[in-house]
Amino acid sequence: MSGNSFERSDESNEQSSISIIEYVWIGGNGELRSKTRVLYSSIMTGYKLSDIPVWNYDGSSTNQANGSSSEVFLYPRNIYRCPFRRNVNGVIVICDTYDVNGVPLETNHRHNANIIFEKYQNEKPWYGLEQEYFIFRKDTNQPIGMEYASKQGQYYCSVGSQNAYGRRISDEHMEACLYAGIKISGTNLEVAPGQHEFQIGPVEGIDAADQLWIARFILEKISEHYDRYIVYHPKPLQGDWNGSGCHTNFSTESMRSEGGLTVIMEAVDKLRTKHSEHMKVYGIDNDLRLTGDHETASIDEFSHGIGSRQCSVRIPNDTVKNGYGYFEDRRPAANIDPYQVTSIILQTVCESD
């Protein structure tokens, strides 16, 4: 399911005339926002975007409008099953934002990304997004398990209650994403205590960014149930601790075809020339993470390598062996807007010299 429509598995006569729609959008500071709408109408042939009405909200409360003209309009762009309302006709819609004149807001990065994706749709770009994050306690404002930690290392892909802090949240998140129709492809505990990762993809085009935003939304909703909160900051812990990234795996159809390694190397050269431009949208405070330590490259210099995790762009060994495949851009931070990152990679790689 790419999010455009799906058939309901539960069509109880008692509740088929009620639909609960969760509208999700990105606020003025890059944060997730949502509001709920109940529709008293029957949708018997399956949910489609055309079934979901445009809505609005108070943009002056989200740093996206002033009080004299505060209405901001939500245009549904993709639709998913709601894992929190399984016994009713519940859906989540990812929306982008427009003013009263239909002009996209400055913070509406989806609009500009979609222009790029439409321009290069014949390239069939695939993305695999590796979202790292920390689970924090509200009472200490520290990662869960931090009070027992000595040094990092034992927590990566760990098992056992002395190592694996927050697994219940991670497991519930994975199952909820699968129910929603998100192409989550895995999870693991990460290097620091309370640090986790989930992966989305491979997903083609702008759907990858839509799915990552909704996966984040689901994760943050689940964390509410445990009175915890999610931190995407690139370096929330100072000292000898790993930061959090959103490594972005990318390929076009030509890269995945025979002889694709040559296309990949040409793409790496293009990324090198646009390094500083990319870093502008690769996450706030990313300089605290990209130091050359803790499996990162320096933010000041572009580098690439085969199988290396201490470079800007990694080319997997299997890609070199096969002569085709994908590359991994390791520079994006965990707090990126995926619309900006996925689209700038596509534009840089595919634009003519």
Swiss-Prot record:
Instruction: Enumerate the catalysed reactions.
Output: L-glutamate + NH4(+) + ATP = L-glutamine + ADP + phosphate + H(+)
Q: Which PROSITE patterns does the record match to this protein? A: GLNA_1, GLNA_ATP, GS_BETA_GRASP, GS_CATALYTIC
The EC number(s) given in the record are 6.3.1.2
**Name of protein:** Putative glutamine synthetase
For this protein, the record's PANTHER family field holds:
GLUTAMINE SYNTHETASE, GLUTAMINE SYNTHETASE 2 CYTOPLASMIC
In the record, the note on similarity to other proteins reads: Belongs to the glutamine synthetase family.
Q: Which InterPro entries does the protein's record reference?
A: Gln_synt_N, Gln_synt_N_sf, Gln_synth/guanido_kin_cat_dom, Gln_synth_cat_dom, Gln_synth_gly_rich_site, Gln_synth_N_conserv_site, Glutamine_Synthetase
Q: Per UniProt, which keywords does this protein have?
A: ATP-binding, Ligase, Nucleotide-binding
Domain GS catalytic residue range list: 109-353
Q: Would the keyword Ligase turn up in this protein's UniProt record? A: yes
Per its UniProt record, what Pfam families does this chain match? Gln-synt_C (PF00120)
GO MF assignments: ATP binding; glutamine synthetase activity
List GO BP terms, alphabetically: glutamine biosynthetic process
Ranges for domain GS beta-grasp: 19-102
